[in-house]
Amino acid sequence: MKIQGVFRNRWKTALIGGGLGLLWCVGCLLPAAAAADSLTLWYDRPADGYPDARKPRKAWERHALPLGNGFLGAMLFGGPAEEHLQLNLHSLWSGGPGVPGWKPAPNLEGAAAHLPEIRQTLLAGDRKKAQALSTEWLRGDGPGDRAELNKLFGAYQTFGDLFIATGTAEPVTEYRRALDLSTALHTVRYRSGGARFTRTAFCSYPDRCLVVRFAADQPGRQNLSLRLTSPHAVRGRAEDGVFVVRGTVRDNGLKLDVRVGALAEGGTVTVSDDGIRVEHADAVTFVLVGGTDYAQKWPTFRGADPAAKNRERLAAALRLGFARLKERHVADHHALHGRVSVDWGSTPEAIRALPTDVRLERNKKIPDLDLEELYFQFGRYLLIASSRPGSLPANLQGLWCDQLNPPWRIDYHLNINLEMNYWPSGPGNLLEC
């Protein structure tokens, strides 16, 4: 499929316009691209290895790489000594039911009857009248300039951060961190202490879990320590060989449940209330699941405790094992992402072999057509990662947020931003998303 002209321009508009659409910072989230593979982003250093990454938010915003399955998102930093994954759950919001003083906004009697009129007015080109009707009938109590409304409305928030210390202390060479858009696999490779280390991570939609595997070309080299931190009111505990973190959002009582299991090849695994410790293993696969008790049930917006479903989901994923989980994930993702290819010209091989951050800087002066193709495909990747059947829609930052009080609460702006997230779904052949 060769996409040119208006489709190309629409994609650029959708990716860039509005500042905080699905790709609110695609120029920042587009770190480094592939040597010989036109669908791979790659770095020659960890996310926190850049001069502007001394501030954690800069490393997150500009250099970490995103994974997601619509329900669960992660930003990966790729440090040799410690892997850092910032985590998101698609329904983790503050505010709303449970906050003192909150009450459901009353329905506007007769509002639904005005929707056909608003649509016809728009089709007739009378935007001023359509705006006036929408303002009158399609509205509700939301955030504004008053602090009390912002508190009641709440915000989309981070769950917290997963850290996996590797014990790597020797100098590191041949470092490469990559995200293959065609498979949605994140990899880290490097040499240290005479061994070659490899990590593979992905967020599976079929099995609703995050998977991170640590391996090396020498036996017994995996000595890992996993811990999880969160700004919410949560506590960790060991439960039947699984590390469980449970609690609530402080202001509204939304229940949170995240579970991590480990599959070790050789060595020993110890699970405690503080995390997971693996010693002298040949390879280790961590599997993480998570959820909240949010449900689309007015007016409480609460459903079943997520613990039972997470316990069942994690057990099923651990039974499948790494190879089968990966196979199912890649097949699911590629069935969507592999539908569309673009050809807007070619870039010399010597340029395509550069890390993408270098290519981005170079592109300011010398056009890189293959980089534009990569940009297009990265947009499709992010829509797949942040919006899948059954999940909430992509918000102002898709699925990824590392704060408690983010810009515009990373909510759903119906004036234009939510629509912009999904403009590319047609030209990108992703209508299921």
Predicted regions and their residues:
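N-terminal secretory signal peptides that target proteins for export/translocation
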Residues: 1-11
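Bacterial N-terminal signal peptides
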Residues: 17-28
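Aromatic-residue-lined binding/catalytic grooves and analogous aromatic/hydrophobic interfacial grooves
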Residues: 34-433
